[in-house]
């Protein structure tokens, strides 16, 4: 009896883990694919296109795909917002990594610079023209969206879920 119950619990926990992993991975992969599809368009990678033109297009796309924001960053690592001065993101580790390696970056959760309160995960993708990095696009995924994935998966199976960050820290738990 006890061995059977243990095996059932083990299977339920494994199924919940697979479910959470698939859902979180799907959201990140979806974000990477969206950014990649935009990054190959000259209207985004070409530095001769004014930054605010890029931002206006991104603002329309943001709401459609359910992100906090999708932003343009220029080659000087400044992020642009309509109606505001460009803000430097050069001190952000993920931006330094992206601009030095040319590889997409996915962050752990952090408080968004826009308000300093909203927790989010960021997916950033480089913009390149003739092999040179001309900037990047990034999108922010609400922390609560990821937490809800954990809650739904753990509530369904009656298990607990913990999201571990890239440095082994607990990002969220149910």
Set out the residue ranges of the language-model regions.
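Amphipathic alpha-helical segments in well-structured domains
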Residues: 10, 55, 91-95
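Juxtamembrane extracytoplasmic/periplasmic/luminal helical "stalk" adjacent to the first N-terminal
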Residues: 1-49, 65-67
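Short acidic-hydrophobic sequence patches enriched in Asp/Glu that either
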Residues: 9, 87-90, 163
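Solvent-exposed, extracytoplasmic
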Residues: 49-66, 97, 136, 140-174
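Conserved beta-strand cores of small sensory beta-sandwich domains that regulate signal transduction
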Residues: 36, 69-71, 160-162
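Extracytoplasmic/periplasmic ligand-binding sensor regions of membrane-associated signaling proteins
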Residues: 63-64, 70, 75-153
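Short, solvent-exposed secondary-structure junction/capping segments
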Residues: 40-43, 77-78, 168-169
């Amino acid at each position: 009896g006890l061995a059977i119950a243990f095996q059932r619990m083990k299977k339920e926990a494994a199924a919940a883990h697979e479910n959470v992993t698939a859902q979180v991975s799907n959201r990140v992969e979806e974000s990477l694919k969206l950014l990649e599809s935009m990054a190959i368009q000259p209207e985004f990678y070409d530095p001769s296109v004014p930054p605010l033109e890029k931002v206006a297009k991104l603002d329309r796309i943001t709401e459609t795909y359910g992100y906090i924001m999708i932003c343009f960053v220029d080659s000087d690592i400044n992020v642009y917002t309509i109606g505001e001065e460009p803000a430097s993101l050069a001190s952000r580790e993920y931006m330094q990594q992206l601009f030095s390696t040319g590889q997409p970056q996915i962050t752990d959760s952090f408080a968004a610079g826009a308000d300093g309160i909203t927790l989010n995960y960021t997916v950033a993708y480089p913009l390149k023209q003739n092999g040179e990095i001309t900037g990047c696009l990034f999108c922010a995924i609400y922390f609560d969206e990821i937490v809800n994935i954990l809650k739904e998966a753990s509530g369904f199976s009656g298990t607990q879920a913990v999201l571990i960050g890239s440095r082994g820290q607990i990002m969220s738990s149910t």
